[in-house]
Amino acid sequence: MDENETNQLLMTSNQYPKEAVRKRQNSRNSGGSDSSRFSRKSFKLDYRLEEDVTKSKKGKDGRFVNPWPTWKNPSIPSLLRWVITERDHSSVPCSKELDKELPVLKPYFIDDPEEAGVRGAGLRVTWLGHATVMVEMDELILLTDPIFSARASPSQRMGPKRFRRAPCTVEELPRIDAVLVSHNHYDHLDCNSVIALNERFGNELRWFVPLGLLDWMQKCGCENVIELDWWEENCVPGHDKVTFVFTPSQHWCKRTLMDDNKVLWGSWSVLGPWNRFFFAGDTGYCSAFEEIGKRFGPFDLAAIPIGAYEPRWFMKYQHVDPEEAVKIHIDVQAKKSVAIHWGTFALANEHYLEPPAKLCEALEKYRLKTEDFLVLKHGESRYLNTDDEDVE
């Protein structure tokens, strides 16, 4: 997207109204993918200039930093202390026991791919393991942080291995219109999955990625890529009424030895005429979620992490625990949430079944119903009706 075309995409109001998608001038070329390739630009946002929003920040070395007092950088000594002195309580059992405790279901779309894509005000969510969810809303099908590989690692011969297989392959997915990437850690941005999705869908698939990730996406062959800073927005061509806003989170980025925080991290707020979806990505707890809820809430559905949180002295800055996940649910004003980032990879020291148990305790503490924060089986779908009653 060139500068002249970008300048045509102007906002027409200072405040995002909760009752409808913001109207904006849109003289974008209807030709589609050619005009959107390798884009570093978005609509011009008035609210990005507001004084009370937390803007992305870089340090003196030009790398992104977390702007909240709730953040502390992970250090090599603290990492070594965790690895050497902390006991691993994950206790992942054999496959037979896992099949009983964490069954992997066949997603509905494998046998009936034509059924994918809800109409009107309906919303359906399918958990595909870890932070990968498929969301059908407002005539679009979205995928978050796709990883279908056996390992979350630069090599499929070593590194964290799934103890629950992916419920489907990329080839078995239905039509996907957009992929949301929260950050570049290997368990959220898997090169093999990106390449497979790009080979399957090509330029028909729009990628929404954080600032600094565009070059990496290009090297994977992806062309229909939109790279955004916090509080910037864009859309899928032909679906201008659904707005994708890159919003803050408290985390960090790294893929190689020397590239710490050269790429931004964040969450996603997807705002449609019928539904609103929030994807928290990977995050510690911070004040950003109240800002997001204030501007874009209430959300019909939020996908919020509940796992990889022990030991707290090391993990709390980068990974919320189940109680903090409930706080995010409240902060963003989610009507329903779905638990992600658990039950797939053993990335921390809590027992592999502890996250949903602790989530139930937290929901009771905050006087919320268990059905307010869904815990799905791998491959399971849930349909959310317009009257806010969920149906399997």
Swiss-Prot record:
GO MF terms held by the record: N-acylphosphatidylethanolamine-specific phospholipase D activity; zinc ion binding
Subcellular location, record wording: Golgi apparatus membrane; Early endosome membrane; Nucleus envelope; Nucleus, Nucleoplasm
Residues binding Zn(2+) 2: D187, H188, D282, H341
UniProt binding sites for deoxycholate: K254, M258, A346
Entry-annotated residues carrying N-acetylmethionine: M1
Disordered: region residues: 1-39
Bias type Polar residues, positions: 1-16
Assigned keywords, A-Z: Acetylation, Endosome, Golgi apparatus, Hydrolase, Lipid degradation, Lipid metabolism, Membrane, Metal-binding, Nucleus, Phospholipid degradation, Phospholipid metabolism, Zinc
Tissue specificity note: Widely expressed. Highest expression in brain, kidney and testis (at protein level). Expressed in adipose tissue (at protein level).
Reaction catalysed by this enzyme: an N-acyl-1,2-diacyl-sn-glycero-3-phosphoethanolamine + H2O = an N-acylethanolamine + a 1,2-diacyl-sn-glycero-3-phosphate + H(+); N-butanoyl-1-hexadecanoyl-2-(9Z,12Z-octadecadienoyl)-sn-glycero-3-phosphoethanolamine + H2O = N-butanoyl ethanolamine + 1-hexadecanoyl-2-(9Z,12Z-octadecadienoyl)-sn-glycero-3-phosphate + H(+); N-hexanoyl-1-hexadecanoyl-2-(9Z,12Z-octadecadienoyl)-sn-glycero-3-phosphoethanolamine + H2O = N-hexanoyl ethanolamine + 1-hexadecanoyl-2-(9Z,12Z-octadecadienoyl)-sn-glycero-3-phosphate + H(+); N-octanoyl-1-hexadecanoyl-2-(9Z,12Z-octadecadienoyl)-sn-glycero-3-phosphoethanolamine + H2O = N-octanoyl ethanolamine + 1-hexadecanoyl-2-(9Z,12Z-octadecadienoyl)-sn-glycero-3-phosphate + H(+)
EC number assigned by the record: 3.1.4.54
Stated name of the protein: N-acyl-phosphatidylethanolamine-hydrolyzing phospholipase D
Binding site for Zn(2+) 1: H183, H185, H251, D282
Self-association and partners: Homodimer. Bile acids promote the assembly of inactive monomers into an active dimer and enable catalysis.
Regulation: Activated by divalent cations. Activated by bile acids.
